[in-house]
Amino acid sequence: MLNAVSDSLLSIFYPQNCHICKNSVENRANGVACEACWKNTHIFSDKDVICGKCCAFLPESGHTTEAFCRQCDEHVYDSVRAVGVYELALAASIVHLKTTPFAVEKLRFLLNKAFLASPFLNTDLIVPVPLSSRRLLERGFNQAGLIAGSLSKNTGIALDEYSLVRTIHTPMHRAAMDKKAREMTVKNAFEVKRPKLMAGRNILLIDDILTSGSTASHCAKALKKSGASKVNVLTLARAA
């Protein structure tokens, strides 16, 4: 009741328009998008049959266990889950996250929900995909670290933001880059500074967007080289 009154007052004195349709955002918990745009955004559910390594949609086949498309077997990580498709409200929220670190309530909620529905509940350690020191200085924060920290707080699973590091400053991935180009930008870009902390652990790697899987795969390679038993990936969105 109080939240509804608060939202009504805020919408009067500090109106906020949806970043997609420009209509008013009535519920501030929805962040930068209105309720209608969130409903039009594809958030994955147990009704979706998706590949366990790239989150691509698979034909209906009566699967009751994890299914794979077999087009992405080269990925080093073991399995991946995403909140939804990189579109509409989810895409707008992730873009906003990169510049406004405090506006992540909706994304935190969705990530936590996706984790609880995932097969990753036996995770020992949560690790965010790191930024290079130069990119971190430019941005001021690591968006993957923000959502990883929130998940750690909600689940009680330990967080390690410092062991996995990006040693090479790589160019930002662009939509037009193909899989091979993305692969080259992150090759040998990651290493683990404290390998003893990874030995024998089930790691959950957190990132904001999964596109080709190259970044997550090279992070997993470094983590497994340091002795990690398993590396699974949880991301906010699967991009086309």
Which role fits each region the language model picked out?
Residues 1-207, 211-240:
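Glycine-rich phosphate/pyrophosphate-handling loop used in enzymes and phosphotransfer proteins
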